[in-house]
């Protein structure tokens, strides 16, 4: 945690702040006691329980992308051989959802009753499994094809021989298995909060029997930059709020 005052006088105060966090978590002394859960979860999620592993590890079969000639996905076995056949026995750790570094940095400013502050939240490193791509670009049922879908399901899927696409041919309606193709680096910078304010202690307030007048305005998450393009606000409503306050002290 860092808090540093760049300028400090009777009328002016300018400071900066920075905090950061890094965490590493590993399993110990599990042995084979959770092997039954590892086997059961292979087609359900990316979490496995092994000694020395992390609860944030993302397990999947490695993918070499979509074959331009056939529109089928090419997988890698544990030995590094290419194959069209997906086998969960070939899964390895393909990422970790825990960031390498995350925290908040910002600055605050005061000058003769005026105040302003801005804070940014950052996340560097780590990966994410793209559920939007997995469930709404591929793995779309025939009936769902007639409904509104992510536009990438139309524009980014394989369409013709030689087409270098990110997603398999839409004609292949079999279920897409979990692979590293849906794991992406997850770096984020968010404008977490911004606020401005003013406080006046002028003698003119005494006419009203008041000692001070304050005004404040606040906005949260005023922008967001991310290395992934994913849906937000599906499971929990996403909100960007703006608030104002006016106070009179007697």
Question: What are these model-derived regions, one by one?
Answer:
Residues 5-97:
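Conserved small-residue
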Residues 6, 20-26, 111-113, 122-126, ...:
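Transmembrane beta-strands of outer-membrane beta-barrel pores
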Residues 10, 113-118, 203-206, 242:
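Repeated loop/turn-to-beta-strand initiation elements of outer-membrane beta-barrel proteins
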Residues 12, 99-103, 187-192, 211, ...:
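Residues that define the transmembrane beta-barrel architecture of outer-membrane proteins
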Residues 16-18, 118, 215-217, 246:
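Membrane-embedded beta-strand positions of outer-membrane beta-barrel proteins
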Residues 25-41, 45, 125-153, 225-232:
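Outer-membrane beta-barrel and related beta-rich outer-membrane complex signature
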Residues 38-70, 151-163, 176-178, 218-250:
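C-terminal beta-signal and terminal closure region of outer-membrane beta-barrel proteins
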Residues 123-214, 219:
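Extracytoplasmic gating/loop element in the C-terminal half of outer-membrane beta-barrel translocons
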